[in-house]
């Protein structure tokens, strides 16, 4: 990269993109960001996020290393519409030399290591209608296995006795970018979240 500006400018009026940038500044944990309400269209309607990755050149000047749609898009076949956009991760405290290779090139991870972070955008499918049946052959175990196969270890954290409930050893910073979603905790209390609402999940058992 010669340090020139990307050929396609940022869309300043797009609230979703602005919130993605703010979320990246917060860092830490596994970031849940996007949802759709019961009236929302299929998750495929959401444009894949573009990622501007910065670094430094050999002269120490700041440059754009890339500006494109992330190649790490994970779709869960057992839950059509559930899509993870893996944007960036760190392992431990980064040196910030600006010369580091893109950490997303090797593959995906379910969670960061000690002191690390993961920046991801999650698109949840709309609320299922009453009587909805999963795709043929899909069971709870097969669905969680697929989740762990595609995002290593993630399916292991789900409670088999209470579908959807899960606990992770992370602090998750979340922003509802579009749509609405409901967060439920152990005591049965729920909070209904709207566009722009934020969540700090302190390693607590929960479901969406």
Where are these regions (language model features)?
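C-terminal segment of N-terminal export signals and the immediately downstream linker at the start
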Residues: 33-65
């Amino acid at each position: 990269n010669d340090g020139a500006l990307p050929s396609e400018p940022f869309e300043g009026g797009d609230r979703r993109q602005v919130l993605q940038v703010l979320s990246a500044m917060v860092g830490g944990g596994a970031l849940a960001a996007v949802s759709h309400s019961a009236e929302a269209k299929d998750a495929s309607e959401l444009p894949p996020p573009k990622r501007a990755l910065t670094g430094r050149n050999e002269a120490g000047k700041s440059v754009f290393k890339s500006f494109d749609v992330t190649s790490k898009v994970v779709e869960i076949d057992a839950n059509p519409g559930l899509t993870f956009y893996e944007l960036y991760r760190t392992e431990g405290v980064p040196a910030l030399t600006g010369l580091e290779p893109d950490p997303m090139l090797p593959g995906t991870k379910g969670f960061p290591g000690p002191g690390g972070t993961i920046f991801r955008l999650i698109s949840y499918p709309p609320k299922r209608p009453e009587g909805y049946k999963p795709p043929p052959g899909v069971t709870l175990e097969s669905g969680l296995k697929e989740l762990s196969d595609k995002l290593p270890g993630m399916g292991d954290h789900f409670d088999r006795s209470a579908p959807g409930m899960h606990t992770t050893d992370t602090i998750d910073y979340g922003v509802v970018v579009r749509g609405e979603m409901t967060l439920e905790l152990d005591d049965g209390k729920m909070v209904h979240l709207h566009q722009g609402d934020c969540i700090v999940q302190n390693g607590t058992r929960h479901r969406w």
